[in-house]
Each structure stands twice: as C-alpha cells, then as structure tokens.
Amino acid sequence: MSGSTGERSFADIITSIRYWVIHSITIPSLFIAGWLFVSTGLAYDVFGSPRPNEYFTENRQGIPLITGRFDSLEQLDEFSRSF
C-alpha cells in the first residue's frame, strides 16, 4: 500500500490554467532566444568554433589529415603552424 506524498498529480498540473499561462510564455521565448543565439553568430563566439566561411582560409586550402602513424606529432605541429 502506498501513501500519499501530498504532491499534485501530473494530470492535475497539465490541465490547470496556471501551467499553460506560464508555459505559453516560457517555451516560445526559449525557442526565440535559442534561434537568436545561433542566427546572430553569438554561438560561434561563445564556443570558439569557426564560422562556415573560416574553415578553409586563402592560405590553408588542404584538409587537415594525419596520415602517418609514427610521425603524427610532426604533422600536428605542421598543421598548427599554418594557423
């Protein structure tokens, strides 16, 4: 036999007007904030990832592949010097 914890049931919560008043404002505003975060380019600045036009610059057009198993550190150093 289980006891009552005194909490409201899930069905009671999602059928209340208070729930929908709060969430009809917060869910769209979170969506809009996320869209603005990505569309303005702020996400690139915050996380430090290159923008789509910065992956391959004029002086670096090759794909950064490591091909050797034993000289991988030299290849990484050579690649990092091209920045």
UniProtKB/Swiss-Prot annotation:
Q: From which domain of life does this come?
A: Eukaryota
Q: Which SUPFAM superfamilies match?
A: Cytochrome b559 subunits (SSF161045)
Any idea where this protein resides?
Plastid, Chloroplast thylakoid membrane
Q: Is Transmembrane one of the keywords? A: yes
Tell me any Pfam family this protein matches: Cytochrom_B559a
Task: Set out the biological process GO terms recorded for this chain's protein.
Answer: photosynthetic electron transport chain
Q: What does this protein do?
A: This b-type cytochrome is tightly associated with the reaction center of photosystem II (PSII). PSII is a light-driven water:plastoquinone oxidoreductase that uses light energy to abstract electrons from H(2)O, generating O(2) and a proton gradient subsequently used for ATP formation. It consists of a core antenna complex that captures photons, and an electron transfer chain that converts photonic excitation into a charge separation.
Q: What is this protein called?
A: Cytochrome b559 subunit alpha
Originating organism: Helianthus annuus (Common sunflower)
